[in-house]
Amino acid sequence: MPWRVAVVLPAREGFSPRAVGAIGLQVAALAGRQDVIVGPPLDGPSLLPDHEYRAVQPGLWPPGRRSLRYAAAIARAVAGTGAAVVEVHNRPDTADYVARHRPGQRVLLVLHNDPQGMRGAETPGQRRDLLRLMDVACVSGWVRQRFLDGLPDSCARQVGLSPNGVALPAMAPPMAQRARRVLFAGRVVADKGADLFVAACARLAPTRPDWDFRMIGADRFRTDAPVTPFVSDLRPKATAAGVDMAGYRPHAEVLAAMAQAAIVVVPSRWPEPFGMTALEAMAAGAALIASPVGGLPEVVGNGGLLCAPDPATGLAHAMAGLMDDLPAREDLAARGRAQAARFGIEHARACRAAMRDAALRRGGA
């Protein structure tokens, strides 16, 4: 596309190799040549050194909460970009501020999480007001349904699907050559079921000494993530269960670990809005076990084993079934690779480009 897009990151989203979350990774993966990234100051080199990055800091005006001052700083920053479309990620209040303070500016709000838990989109009335000013792209059908909940059917035309994408490796190590390892990769928090994973491993480790169990992740997506009470409580339990807690690792190392592990487990309690870890695990050729919540079922399809992780006895049973059955792991890995191919980077870029084009041509309702 020949016109420019200003891509706005949330105020706490990193965009450097050693400090980046899921949103930043997808922004980098789907970026167009004309994109300028606008967000908080970087903690290191940019993920996209060939793209312009405009760092913003909340000023003193307008008075009020920090998120309002960040939105005002964003509005000032995008004014000088010459962007035809301002693409705001996961912050309805920021998108609303930009649209209201820059009349005529085309805005696309990209939602990665449940909008009903976001400031400025909690109620149907707020979501309807957003559609008067902008178009909305959702990373999954589940997120889209949550946005449209309580709105008239006529609103659906302005709320589209723009799924996340994954770079599918040309080859994945055969299951028979992989480490006998069960891997958890993600934030080490209760919502992600980190404690359920440890509890399941504790049941399995004594009877399967030829397998090992590993967790990659921390409370936050950065090397200096805080050691929370949850993490402190989990560490001795993980040690007793024989689970290696590796802490935060850069994204490339996480993908490499997925390519080596036989099984990856995504035992989320909360309704995952998409489930990027599950998609990456399937693309890497691991056998996947995931929770049947939120957007995970539509991402996983038949490419993984859907299993409620709570209580952990059920999760342990599902893990044991795959650990003890190489042909089952091989079959699941093959189906996972096929499912992941449906979410390739080029498809994701095409979906995002179509949403940007619609926002430019249509504007608000």
Question: Model-found features: residue ranges?
Answer:
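Conserved donor-binding/catalytic core segment of Leloir-type glycosyltransferases
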Residues: 135-137, 174-192, 198-203, 214-216
